[in-house]
């Protein structure tokens, strides 16, 4: 009965990705964008894939509370996770077994890395 589930991955180099912050029991506590992370959070190697599943009604109930009061002045969808947690809702994070399947490209270097992975696996168009 989760209000939302996020797909995460553990990676060797989390640079550029939002970090998954868990409590001592392994429960999701926050998703922190790299540019908003402190030194401790930057050490975390579990990252947000950007894949979310939401209970639609619960998502709609928090969307108007998302603010752009962060370093990028952007509206972050992961803030919906924070608001659901603040409302006492259960939110889960599922860690993908193969991080290659959930990586994204935030810059040309990461795109090249994804292309190299695809080539190594024999994927081409």
What residue spans do the PLM features occupy?
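Conserved beta-loop-beta/alpha segment of the NTase-like Rossmann-fold superfamily
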Residues: 1-25, 52-56, 61-67
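Catalytic-core segments of class I nucleotidyltransferases/pyrophosphorylases
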Residues: 29-102, 106-124
């Amino acid at each position: 009965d989760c209000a939302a589930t996020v797909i995460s991955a553990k990676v060797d180099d989390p640079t550029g990705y939002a970090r998954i912050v868990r409590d001592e029991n392994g429960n999701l506590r926050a998703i922190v964008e790299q540019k908003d992370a402190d030194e401790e959070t930057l050490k975390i190697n579990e990252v947000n894939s950007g894949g979310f599943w939401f209970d639609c009604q619960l998502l709609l109930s928090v969307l108007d509370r998302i603010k752009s009061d962060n370093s990028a002045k952007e509206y972050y969808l992961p803030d919906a996770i924070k608001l659901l947690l603040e409302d006492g809702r259960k939110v889960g994070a599922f860690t993908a077994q193969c991080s290659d399947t959930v990586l994204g490209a935030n810059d040309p270097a990461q795109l090249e890395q994804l292309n190299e992975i695809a080539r190594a696996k024999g994927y081409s168009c």
